[in-house]
């Protein structure tokens, strides 16, 4: 392939993908980690301060899952504001995809030590935010949606295995 063909191929991809600077991607990873930390903290607080005292008289089997969903929604709002501030393309799609892909995280890590649940929450949110920020770079909306929905479905299927 000569230089002309290489530059034409590069120009085609430039038209199909929104540019994501390495610094911007690093900010998204940090923001995802912060969101994971917020989810972890809020899950604990919502479970201990709201769900168990108000709704559980005895054994409460779904308290962690419900608290995790509430925490995911609240932390998603914080993550959305951060992504908008960073200037990422399609921030709402990133937050929704990460929330759906990681929905039930509190239930997945239930029974682990607190430091393990903290690690997995921070790591998985950082990875999810970075991955979805990368996938939504596709300029046409429909192909971007197809890719994101496909990845979310794969994440949910692998989560059940």
Q: How should these model regions be labeled?
A:
Residues 50-63, 75-87, 103-112:
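Short juxtamembrane and helix-loop transition motifs at transmembrane-helix boundaries
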Residues 1-30:
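N-terminal juxtamembrane cytosolic/stromal segments of multi-pass membrane proteins
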Residues 29-76:
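Hydrophobic transmembrane helix segments
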Residues 28, 85-96, 140-143:
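Membrane-interfacial loop-to-transmembrane alpha-helix junctions, especially the N-terminal start
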Residues 37-43, 97-109, 148-160:
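Aromatic-anchored segments of alpha-helical transmembrane domains
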Residues 88-131:
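Short alpha-helical packing/oligomerization segments
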Residues 67-82, 120-125:
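Hydrophobic alpha-helical transmembrane segments
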Residues 130-161:
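Terminal transmembrane helical module of multi-pass membrane proteins
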